[in-house]
Amino acid sequence: MKIIVFLAVLMLVSAQVCLVSAAEMEHSSDNELSSRDLVKRFPLPSCVYTRTCGKRDIESSEGANGGE
C-alpha cells in the first residue's frame, strides 16, 4: 500500500514539473530553454559534472600511501 501511495505522489510531482516547464517554454521568446536556464532551475551537485559521484579517487589515495 505504501508503495502505491509513493508512486502516486511521484507521478503527481513529475507531472507538475512537466506542466511548469511546458508553461515556461510557451512564455519564452524562442520556445527553447537553454542549458544555462536549466542549470539555474535545477542545480546539480558538482560531482555530476566531474562524474565522480560515489567514487573514491583511487589515484590520489595511491599517491598518498606511497604506492604501497
Curated annotation (Swiss-Prot):
Keywords per UniProt: Amidation, Amphibian defense peptide, Cleavage on pair of basic residues, Disulfide bond, Secreted, Signal
Subcellular location: Secreted
Residues making up the signal peptide according to the UniProt record: 1-15
Tissue: Expressed by the skin glands.
Positions carrying Cysteine amide: C53
Gene Ontology CC: one annotated term: extracellular region
Keyword Signal in annotation: yes
Disulfide bridges in this chain: C47-C53
Keyword Disulfide bond annotated: yes
Prosequence residues removed at maturation: 16-41, 57-68
GO biological process: defense response
Name of this protein: Riparin-1.6
Organism: Crinia riparia (Streambank froglet)
Lineage: Eukaryota, Metazoa, Chordata, Craniata, Vertebrata
